[in-house]
């Protein structure tokens, strides 16, 4: 069977024969050469060339009966060479966001007669559209997936019409699957899914993600990739963005005013502006490299998780709904919490805070502010406290917890405290006051107490006979002369320097 090239050559040969002057003796009278125009035939096997985004070489066959022919390359991004059968067009990868086009002019000459024809050349962008209107994709794995799922007419290409019906794309790499799966390395071409609402591309090998202008997107999960830059600007309906466990240094959010959930822990962000997001509810940027973050004037924000960064300050204005603030393990020197009337949990441990005023936070239940420089701690009249850990600070003198009757856990060790009043904390189950200057502890009313750690204090007499639920009691490093327990009282984890000081009643 003849191949296409042979068929093309045979057709041209036929044309050439038909155009050849007759040799039967009935030749027309000779015409002067300068008056006789040559009949030039100039044919290509294709007048339109499409080069894929990754680049490559395309050969075009040129057949002519002219005495000579040449070409003019008007394309700056492609190289053209003449071959024995025509021309060879070479282009490198198209890294731009749009298709690029150009023309090559073929000029055939016989005597004074010239014939010109143009070859149109187009190189598609990664994720662009071919001259036939079909969609292209940079990553062959991504392309194979969409073709297997959405090439409804089975022609081996994805049309714009086929892409338009897609609202959900689940591209998550499931490592638990028994079937072998290849990771997707690029989502260039995804913008062709103009009606996409939900996208899950987690667990792949993406290095960048450009979803800008995809106005119908509401949900994106691109976690567990290697993404350094995320662009969702112009995604005006985006509500959920999950991008944790990446390498992101930049997230573009312009126009995302409906954003509700923003979770991007363990990335490389150094700054970000989330201020004035009227619908934002949940913010999690733990374990980044943040030195600056703006999230003021977010009236619906309830949770801000910002631990393990490099923050030195926080602007907490315009956050009336905030009830959980985690800003531990930073370099923060002060916190103004005066506008956070609904705050219930504050985790600000391991910072450089010198004083903390909680008098405006009457709903606060959990406070962990250990490992700071706090010399002044104002707890106010809050009766909602269930946990306070202010250990390893610079507190001194007496601390009175007695009015916080709902307290279940207290940690105040590692301070210069001389007196701790917990006499009315009847719900208390755990008290840790080790390494202080406390000389006595009154715990007889604490019948719910299960753990008491008071190592390295100045306690000489201790009566725990009324604390029948105690399972842990540490009193090492004290000048203890008497420890009174109830008859039959058994403490599973009991540590004292001299067990002879124990008596029972």
For each of these PLM feature ranges, what is it?
Residues 2-6, 10, 14-48, 115-135:
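Bacterial Sec-dependent N-terminal signal peptides
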Residues 29-35, 49-50, 55-60, 77-79, ...:
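N-terminal capping/linker segments that flank leucine-rich repeat
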Residues 39-44, 57-90:
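Surface-exposed binding patches on compact interaction domains or structured appendages
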Residues 97-112:
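A short beta-strand micro-motif common to beta-rich folds, especially ectodomain repeats
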Residues 169-172, 199-201, 218-222, 241-243, ...:
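Conserved hydrophobic beta-strand positions in leucine-rich repeat
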Residues 187-190, 209-211, 230, 251, ...:
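Canonical leucine-rich repeat
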Residues 193-195, 214-217, 235-238, 256-259, ...:
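Leucine-rich repeat
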Residues 204, 225, 246, 267, ...:
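Consensus "Asn ladder" position of solenoid repeat domains
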């Amino acid at each position: 069977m003849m191949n296409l090239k042979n068929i093309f050559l045979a057709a041209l040969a036929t044309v050439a024969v038909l155009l050849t002057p007759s040799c039967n003796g009935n030749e027309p009278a000779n015409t002067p050469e300068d008056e006789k125009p040559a009949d030039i035939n100039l044919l290509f096997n294709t007048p339109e060339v499409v080069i894929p985004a990754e680049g490559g070489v395309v050969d075009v066959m040129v057949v002519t009966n002219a005495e000579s022919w040449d070409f003019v390359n008007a394309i700056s991004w492609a190289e053209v060479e003449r071959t024995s059968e025509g021309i060879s067009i070479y282009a490198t990868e198209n890294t731009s966001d749009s298709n690029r086009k150009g023309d090559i002019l073929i000029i055939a000459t016989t005597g004074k007669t010239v014939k010109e024809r143009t070859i149109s050349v187009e190189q598609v962008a990664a994720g662009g559209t071919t001259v036939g209107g079909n969609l292209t994709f940079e990553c062959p794995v991504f392309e194979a997936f969409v073709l297997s799922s959405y090439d409804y007419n089975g022609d081996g290409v994805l049309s714009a019409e086929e892409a338009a019906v897609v609202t959900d794309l689940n591209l998550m790499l499931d490592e638990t699957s028994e079937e072998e799966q290849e990771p997707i390395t690029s989502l260039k071409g995804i913008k062709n899914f103009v009606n996409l609402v939900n996208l899950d591309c987690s667990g792949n090998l993406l290095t960048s993600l450009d979803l800008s202008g995809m106005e119908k997107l509401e949900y994106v999960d691109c976690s567990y990739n290697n993404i350094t830059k995320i662009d969702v600007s112009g995604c005006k309906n985006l509500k959920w963005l999950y991008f944790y466990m990446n390498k992101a240094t930049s997230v573009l959010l312009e126009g995302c005013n409906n954003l509700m959930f923003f979770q991007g822990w363990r990335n490389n962000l150094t700054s970000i502006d989330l201020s004035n997001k009227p619908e934002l509810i949940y913010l999690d940027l733990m374990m980044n490299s943040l030195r600056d973050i703006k999230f003021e004037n977010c009236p619906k924000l309830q949770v801000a998780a910002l631990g393990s960064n490099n923050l030195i300050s926080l602007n907490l204005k315009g956050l009336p709904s905030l009830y959980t603030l985690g800003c531990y393990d930073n370099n923060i020197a002060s916190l103004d919490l005066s506008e956070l009337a609904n705050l219930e949990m504050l985790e600000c441990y391991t910072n450089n805070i010198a004083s903390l005023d909680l008098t405006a936070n009457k709903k606060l239940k959990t406070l962990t502010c250990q490992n700071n420089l706090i010399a002044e701690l104002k707890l106010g009249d809050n009766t909602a406290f269930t946990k306070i850990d202010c250990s390893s600070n610079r507190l001194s003198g007496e601390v009175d917890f007695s009015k916080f009757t709902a307290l279940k856990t207290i940690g105040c060790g590692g301070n210069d405290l001389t007196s701790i009043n917990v006499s009315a904390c009847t719900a208390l189950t755990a008290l840790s006051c080790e390494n202080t200057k406390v000389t006595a502890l009154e715990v007889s009313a604490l019948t719910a107490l299960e753990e008491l750690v008071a190592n390295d204090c100045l306690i000489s007499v201790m009566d725990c006979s009324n604390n029948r639920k105690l399972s842990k009691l540490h009193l090492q490093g004290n000048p203890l002369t008497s420890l009174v327990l109830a008859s039959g009282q058994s403490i599973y984890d009991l540590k004292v320097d001299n067990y002879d000081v124990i008596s029972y009643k």
